[in-house]
Amino acid sequence: MSVTTSTIADLGRRARAAAPTLAVASTDQKNAALDAAADRILEGNELDLVRGEIEGISANLLDRLRLDGSRLEGMASGLRQVAELPDPVGEVTAAWDRPNGLHISKVRVPLGVVAIIYEMRPNVTSDAFGLCLKSGNVAFLRGSSAALDSNRVIAASIRAAVAGTGLPADALVLVEDVSREAAVEFMQLRESIDCLIPRGGPSLIRSIVDNATVPYVIDGDGNCHVYVDASADLDMAVSILHNAKTHRPSVCNAAESLVVHADVADEFLPVALAALDGVEFVGDGRSRLIAPSIGVAEDDDFATEFLDLKISVRVVNNLDEAIEHVNQAGSGHSEAIVTSDEAAAQRFCKEVDAAAVLVNASTRFVDGEEFGFGAEIGISTQKLHARGPMGLPQLTTEKYVVRGDGQVRA
């Protein structure tokens, strides 16, 4: 059944109405709701996989839909882990005294209603709820048609669990209309939404930029690079590249492009191709002269997030060319250098414009859980108000609290 514009607005009003209660909920209340929700995460995924296979969704995109026993356990475990994390609400981030006797402090407070519009992965329903609740925010969610059945079941389970602990069920509000018109209306609920976070591909991001009238944080493309420097330990480089590309190719922190210094390209590329058997390599002319099995890369390939077992290759003469290429073709997500030259590592870290830069480590580590944040709401590729993995602190804002004893301004 299609949900009308007025109904979407009603959902927004419900989310807004629940926000004040969540903003002042105690840590114990929030943790109890998280633990209860973890116990209620059950089923509803089989239909989505069947539909996906019928509609011809690729295997790697089906991986985003899959919620087998281990992933369901992972969702429940993620909620419990968030319950164990420090509550950011009420944290004093700075405090000072003025000569006139005023005491000024900055205190973390919830954003209010955090809207998330996302594609494919139904586990986002659980992850987003957990982080929003622990940070005192309402989770206002709109998923994709492919995962609708799972999202409904997960949301219903969570809402029932939350209500059973005394907090409002509307701590999670799910929009079930998956039409484009509903998505645009969702992006424009200025009276209800404090922050919108998209979790999806380029078309979703373009839609947000073109249509959203609410504040948003872009969880953008992950066109991530691995640069193998002239001084690199080549065994280490192969291991890092293999992990970055093949561990989970459908996620945003997977490597999509390989950049190799010319001094080591002759030795490295044949070894890399052999190690990454099953991965399609497309490259520039220099890389194909070294390894003829590398396919011809179109210009767009160097700026493409493949989300599959495919990678582009470019050979460069020096670090300057590597940095220039990464900054030009990259998406500002995560970029890695493999090197034993500390000066090269420092230059790469300073000059590459990305949310995360890694030295001698896989791009797959750019993740809230790996960073110690617990589950993440996304990885921001913009610079305001958050950048990189967004955990609990990034779902708050700061309020100034000023205490005096009768001071007035002269």
Label for each model-derived stretch:
Residues M1-H103:
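N-terminal Rossmann-like NAD(P)+-binding subdomain of aldehyde/semialdehyde dehydrogenases
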Residues S6, D39, M120-N123, D127-V138, ...:
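ALDH superfamily catalytic-core signature
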Residues L67-D68, S77, S179-P198, S203-S207, ...:
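Aldehyde/semialdehyde dehydrogenase
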Residues A95-A139, S144-I154:
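Substrate-binding/gating loop at the entrance of the active-site cleft, primarily
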Residues W96, I104-P110, L133, G164-P168, ...:
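Solvent-exposed alpha-helices and their adjacent loops that cap or buttress functional pockets
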Residues A160-L174:
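A glycine-rich helix N-cap at a beta->alpha junction
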Residues L319, E324-R409:
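C-terminal core of ALDH-fold dehydrogenases
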